[in-house]
Amino acid sequence: RLIAYVESKRYKGVARITEAFRVEYYKLVKRILEEQDQVIDCYAGWASAQIYADGTVWPCCVRADNLGNLRDHDYDFKAIWFGDKIKEVRRSIAAKECYCPLANASYTNMLIDPPTLTRVGIKVIAPE
């Protein structure tokens, strides 16, 4: 019902882009929950990172894989981001060993996913 409600509204300007992404996100979440699988590629650990208040770096806040602490690396993010720990995490994510409907990761993934961007573009340019 939420998807139908959002799609029933008519938005203008930048709000049309937001609405188009929101509908895609809701559809993505529905698929993830139904299929219990990573339905589009996840780029956590490549395109995004989480930095906890104490300086701990995670590739994804759901997995919370501790890659290291900025304080322990003289605040050198690059040393952590290209360190040894991230290699196994990236392999695991690429192998689709995890899935989640988290908005932070999902919106990043949708911005990199050509089919999603195509659907959003069509909805913005030629709304139904």
Give the ranges of each region predicted by the language model.
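Radical SAM enzyme [4Fe-4S]-AdoMet core and its adjacent flexible, acidic
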Residues: 1-58, 62-72, 109-113
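Flexible mid-to-C-terminal extensions adjoining Fe-S/redox cofactors in radical SAM and related proteins
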Residues: 39, 57-128
